[in-house]
Amino acid sequence: MIKTLMGSIRDYMRVTVATPLLVLGEVLCEMLIPFITANLIDAIKDGATVAQMLPTAGFLVLIALTSLAFGAAAGVTCSHASCGFAKNLRHDLFYKIQTFSFANIDEFSSSSLVTRLTTDINNVQQAFMMLIRIAVRAPLVLVFAFAMAYAMGGSVAMVYLVIIPLLGFGLFFIIYKVRPIFARVFRKYDALNESVEENVTGMRVVKSYVREDFEKEKFATAARDVQMDFTRAEKLLAFNNPMMNICVNGAFVVIIYLGSKLIITSQGTLFDVGQLSSIFTYGFQILMSLMQLSMIFVMVTMADESAHRITEVLAAEPTIANPAEPVLEVADGSIDFDHVSFKYSAHAKRQALDDIDLHIKSGETIGIIGGTGSAKSTLVNLIARLYDATEGTVRVGGMDVRDYDLDALRHQVAMVLQKNVLFSGTIAENLRWGDPNATDEEVREAAHLACADEFVDGFPKGYDTWIEQGGSNVSGGQKQRLCIARALLRRPKILILDDSTSAVDTKTDAKIRAGLASYLPNTTKLIIAQRISSVQDADRIIVMEDGRIAQIGNHDELLKTSEIYRETFTSQNKMSAEGEGAVETDTEASATQAQTQEGGEAHE
């Protein structure tokens, strides 16, 4: 774990190493100050003049200023090192996540990854800052202060040697009890972040179902769980300072007693006031170093769990990776599933896809329908290698998808997923995800083919209109059309529309399909839909049921051979007819009402 985290120091290694060295200089200067002060006190007691004390006093000021300079420099280098380390660590973690497949994301969950990128890295940064400065300073002060106190006070200073093990034992016991609580707290932070993420992304649904109170209670419960565990930890940590103060103050009482007795009995020959004053000063330094050490232990205990969570992500191997010698060119848009089976987890009892044998020619338009949970989306996810088949082989352009460079493959397989996602930025910037070099004319053409220009041109800023995070300021249908336009700009060899026109009307749906056919005539198109009208013009239609291909054929063939397809077609036509009838009835009623009103007005 430490080796993994240290890899993120990189270009900040010089300031990281410089910080402890500067701290060492600061501590050495600080240790001299009580010693020089004791000499000044003795000189005053012996009746030295101001002129005689000036060199010693000047040296004391010089040492104090030097200590201040070392301390200030250590503070600057420590800040640079810790902030740079956190920046690199955040960079490494984020870049690692970019290599993850869907399976890796499913393993960690998005809310947990957000916590690791934010809260956990902040904790590790704070611990790193304390380790390179305070964790160096505190032990040095402790050792040097005790050594100087012993040199000046002999057996009187041995009192400190008794309290240090007592405090160490007490601190170890507290940390032993607190550590598992912090581990539990960070797991609950994930639940808290998940609650916030769900609420913010689903705000419209929350408000439409008047679920604000429920969401408030859910968030309050998650926040209360975090609070309760933190409170338990803080209650245990609260014993630390009182325990330390009791031990150190007790030591001071004993030192005053022993020191005073020694001064009186020896009449200042074996032990004097200057030495006693220095021992007290060193005692305060020992106290401060012990308090700093306890702070370090607490911070490191918190950061230890965060560090484990971070390294868990950094050490995770992407389930999907590039081969040693990848193929960089996709020949065409042909797709072959050779007896493919797939399950999301190795421990799953049933296959999500079971023995799929399917062969699609380049340039074909394939419709895919089936009930919820029939694995339609799972099937197409294997084409872009978002998941790897458990059994069998998926080939694109005649090559096993596992032999391709991932970027090369995915650049030729444009997917408009079931969950449409837009990013913060202008409409034009979002569309250029498909092709960063697309001209304004190409952007407008793609938007026109996806029927997105119908609403974009109505915005005051047109294609420069700002899209909020997740596309929250556009409707579901508008979002779908923008995502289709984005995919069109890529001009891929394979285009997959996963229920991507469900939020648009049938007329717009038909216009989009016509645009696809004219704009990408040689592109293989796979259209997943719930409406049969969206796929009935396809070259072939696949009917999925329980992870298997139940039937394949064109529209007319399936009406004869597939009961599922026929029933779906009949029920949708019936609903459509009833809807049209209702519209006609409403129209007639409106006309009758209008005639009645006109007659009444004429009569008046």
Language-model region placement:
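Hydrophobic alpha-helical transmembrane segments of ABC transporter permease domains
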Residues: I2, R10, L21, G25, ...
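An intracellular "coupling" helix at the cytosolic face of ABC transporter transmembrane type-1 domains
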Residues: D11, T99-A103, T119-I132, V136, ...
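Juxtamembrane helix-loop junctions of ABC transporter transmembrane domains
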Residues: L21-L22, C29-D42, I63-S110, V114, ...
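Transmembrane helix-loop-helix hairpins at lipid-water interfaces of multipass membrane proteins
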Residues: R10, T16-A73, T77, Y150-S155, ...
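Alpha-helical transmembrane segments of multi-pass membrane proteins
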Residues: R14-T16, L22, I63-S82, R133-L140, ...
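Helix-loop junctions and hydrophobic alpha-helical segments within the transmembrane domains
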Residues: L93, I97, V206, I310, ...
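Helix-loop-helix
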Residues: D46-T49, M53-G58, M148-V162, L171, ...
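ABC-type nucleotide-binding domain
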Residues: L328-E604
